Regions:
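Alpha-helical ds-nucleic-acid-binding substructure associated with the helix-hairpin-helix region
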Residues: 24
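Terminal helix-turn-helix DNA-binding modules in bacterial transcription factors
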Residues: 6, 14-19, 27, 37-78, ...
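Surface-exposed beta-strand edges and their flanking turn/coil or helix-capping segments
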Residues: 30-31, 73, 91
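Nucleic acid-binding interface residues in structured DNA/RNA-binding domains
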Residues: 87, 92-95
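Key DNA-contact positions within bacterial/archaeal DNA-binding proteins
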Residues: 30, 79-80, 95
Length: 109
């Protein structure tokens, strides 16, 4: 499962589906699902969302890109869906997260 996790991190968890992940692991889809969940405690989709949210947090902290640009960069086709998922996972909207954790100003001071 580590091989798949590292692969997902390199791919930024974008445009991946169950069949592709299972193939990366050399397993059938059902076996992959079971083993992935045992290894990580999450379904593959949840794990991918976590990776994408982590990348989004980094971009919000370190860049001036708009929330929509960040949504597209981390693999969301719909910025509204990104905002909803981000808020659910992080507990703050992307805009509120940026206000609270913006590291660009801290690095300049």
């Amino acid at each position: 499962m580590l091989k798949v996790q590292h692969w997902l991190q390199r791919e930024d968890a974008r445009n991946v589906d169950l069949a592709t992940m299972a193939a990366q692991a050399g397993l059938g889809e059902r076996t992959f699902l079971r083993r992935f969940q045992q290894a990580t405690g999450m379904r593959p989709t949840e794990y991918c969302q976590q990776l994408r949210a982590a990348k989004a947090r980094e971009l919000l902290e370190l860049t001036n890109r708009s929330v929509d640009q960040i949504a597209w960069e981390v693999g969301y086709q719909d910025p509204a869906a990104f905002r909803k998922v981000f808020n659910k996972m992080v507990g703050l909207s992307p805009t509120d997260y940026r206000r609270r954790f913006d590291r660009r100003n801290a690095q300049q001071g």
